[in-house]
Swiss-Prot record:
Name by which UniProt lists this protein: Probable cytosolic iron-sulfur protein assembly protein Ciao1
SUPFAM superfamilies referenced in this protein's UniProt entry, alphabetically: WD40 repeat-like (SSF50978)
WD repeats: from-to residues: 12-51, 57-96, 101-140, 146-185, 192-231, 250-289, 301-335
Pfam family, one: WD40
GO BP terms in the entry: iron-sulfur cluster assembly; protein maturation
Family: Belongs to the WD repeat CIA1 family.
Function: Essential component of the cytosolic iron-sulfur (Fe/S) protein assembly machinery. Required for the maturation of extramitochondrial Fe/S proteins.
Originating species: Drosophila yakuba
Amino acid sequence: MGRLILEHTLQGHKGRIWGVAWHPKGNVFASCGEDKAIRIWSLTGNTWSTKTILSDGHKRTIREIQWSPCGQYLASASFDATTAIWSKSSGEFECNATLEGHENEVKSVSWSRSGGLLATCSRDKSVWIWEVAGDDEFECAAVLNSHTQDVKRVVWHPTKEILASASYDNTIKMYAEEPIDNDWDCTATLTSHTSTIWGIDFDADGERLVSCSDDTTVKIWRAYHPGNSAGVATPDQQTVWKCVCTLSGQHSRAIYDVSWCKLTGLIATACGDDGIRIFKETSDSKPDEPTFEQLTAEESAHDQDVNSVQWNPVVAGQLISCSDDGTIKIWKVTE
């Protein structure tokens, strides 16, 4: 049986903490929250401490942050309807660009693997794709209006320029750029959840996606490409995503975030019942009918809702979480 061991409890933000994001090198992370501030934390010896506080970029709650793949830039999505781009080019972090266009709160932000594209989504039901046009220059490449409700999350595929979004309309959408006319189109709609989808994440090679929802379930989706050996039909030669596994009964309230570890294959969930749960694929799992078991759980990981969980991209088994209770926790998962 696995274990979830608490290594550090960190405080500093005022009010609820919405998001945490590991730097690609794994020795630094950023956090954001209700206090309109971003904190950059780093590890010295065995102690995590705040090195920088960025408090002049947003007028309202900061909902999510993400580092660029190169680690030079940090993007922050805010309820003030803007996305800020921060960099350390001058030695100190500063806001070098503010992306405007959304009509309401920006809920999520994500960099493509190449670092050349940025996606944002909002309560205004739209997903925007921005091209990095040069030093601190961003151009809107597409405005996608496929969802019928508030869009909660955007995540890029780990190897291809394919974007996934999750919404209050209970669906996940996939987008890709048409090679002929260079227009971004919705290429797939994933339906199975019965309530708001809060979080999505790809596995290491991007052939599977995990989602979590207000309906208290976690679902695993698999990509079936044209000519697949399973015989799954692919109309218009488009990849089809099918729900191949549903995990239910483990969570008692809405699941707000899910993270699929690229190093170990473990899945972590952040739940409104204050718990963190870790799932592992079973040894007899089949490609078209995968099975997962709960490896371990901490039912009272935080004193209030857990808003985000993120696996360290470098240190296998290290997990970070944040909560409405105003704390950040760093955990070690053993199998």
